[in-house]
Amino acid sequence: MITSRLFLLTLTVLSCVPTQARPVIATVYHEWYEGRPDYCGGIYRDNKVSAAHPWLPCGTQVNVEYKGRSLVVPITDRCECDSIDLSYRAAKILGVPVDGIARVHIHY
């Protein structure tokens, strides 16, 4: 009983801690992926806001910041390394170069 109360108290305290901005490298999906299945069971579309991450669970809402712009994107796929791959639309909204890479900050 005490253990479960301590566990719930710990969860409550941790859920009140603000997330920290974490710098990562952002890349943009290549147009080749258009219409292909993603890891989370959907179909990748260039015109949808989405992202891939190496270990965050499917459906996690991630706030991505780049040069003063901010956008919440759902994780719908997996990618390699410790980075984030943005859909074409997400990159355009944020101003991330669609033919290169950029350092962004993510909150999750």
Language-model regions: role of each:
Residues 5-15:
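Bacterial N-terminal signal peptides
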